[in-house]
Amino acid sequence: FKKFGEIYFSTIFENKIKAWHLHKESHLNYACISGSVKLVLFDNREGSSSKNMYQEIILSQQNYNLVTIPPNIWNGFKGLNFKESIIANCLTLPHNESEMVRKDPDDKIFNYRW
């Protein structure tokens, strides 16, 4: 954990998807504090050894982890197995809409089946 910028909580319902977004400068620190989610990361950074690769991580109260996501990694999540799940995100910078990029879940650059 590098530093504290802000924390927010995101609610997601079962089988719903919140994707895709990235932060150009901030590191994200996700933890699932209630329910269960599938967190998906996608790297399309030029020169990265993991370029065009996905990583799937199941977060829940039973599989409790803090996942740190560096800048410029696309991410999104899907609610699993619970009516409602809550994700905590502790960012390293205060909220700044101009350092975020958003895409639709079915955007063609991802080619990902939720």
Regions picked out by a protein language model, each given a short descriptive name:
Residues 1-66, 80-114:
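Non-catalytic, conserved peripheral segments adjacent to functional cores
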